[in-house]
Amino acid sequence: MPLSIIHFPHPTLRHVSRPIVRVDAKLKSMADEMLDLMYEFDGVGLAANQVDLPIRMFVANPTGKRDEGESWVILNPEIDRPKGNDTAQEGCLSVPGLYGQVKRPKTVRLRGFDLQGNEINQVLDGFMARVVQHEVDHLDGIMFFDRIGEEGLRDLEGHLEEFKTDYESKQGTGSIADEATLAQQRAEWEAMYTGGTTSNG
């Protein structure tokens, strides 16, 4: 079944993703699908849990264009060594149309691996640093509007309620599975790629 972008308040968006311990052809294919979706919807980054995969992987390209810049696929990312502060507008493909001003470190170090197992250890600044922090937040179950403060959140509350109503409607009609089924699906993905057991939700 092809991957698709899930929308708030789907529970996988709040799930803390586990590190990947296995890379196979299917995982590489899913990374390609994630890049396709990111470019299709004019994004600059997409985390695995945004396509209902509870694994620590994200894709990114700060240009948002397939034929420009570099397409990144990062496994098991970690960020540290934050420096400086910068505030800028962010949006999210899982809450399309919503934006907020988010304060983040201006410079961070990214560590992780690519699909070939090569280690990544790179200091990033500016927009790419912001993109990476946004995606790693996703993998930790954090969305950008969790970081915008009470005043900014008040501006979005009505729109977030609309997303909740739409989600509940789709779950009611069966186009989105119930919570128990979604938890089981996450556990199966974790067992396949993170060494988790199918008893974990």
Swiss-Prot record:
Catalytic activity line of the entry: N-terminal N-formyl-L-methionyl-[peptide] + H2O = N-terminal L-methionyl-[peptide] + formate
EC number: 3.5.1.88
UniProt keyword terms in alphabetical order: Hydrolase, Iron, Metal-binding, Protein biosynthesis
Enzyme class: hydrolase
GO biological process: co-translational protein modification; translation
Record's function text: Removes the formyl group from the N-terminal Met of newly synthesized proteins. Requires at least a dipeptide for an efficient rate of reaction. N-terminal L-methionine is a prerequisite for activity but the enzyme has broad specificity at other positions.
Binding positions for Fe cation per the UniProt entry: 92, 134, 138
Cofactor field: Fe(2+)
Family note: Belongs to the polypeptide deformylase family.
Protein name per its UniProtKB record: Peptide deformylase
CDD domains, alphabetized: Pep_deformylase
UniProt cross-references to Pfam families, sorted A to Z: Pep_deformylase
Cofactor binding note: Binds 1 Fe(2+) ion.
GO molecular function: metal ion binding; peptide deformylase activity
Signal peptide: none
PANTHER family tied to this protein: PEPTIDE DEFORMYLASE
Top-level lineage group: Bacteria
Active-site residue numbers: 135
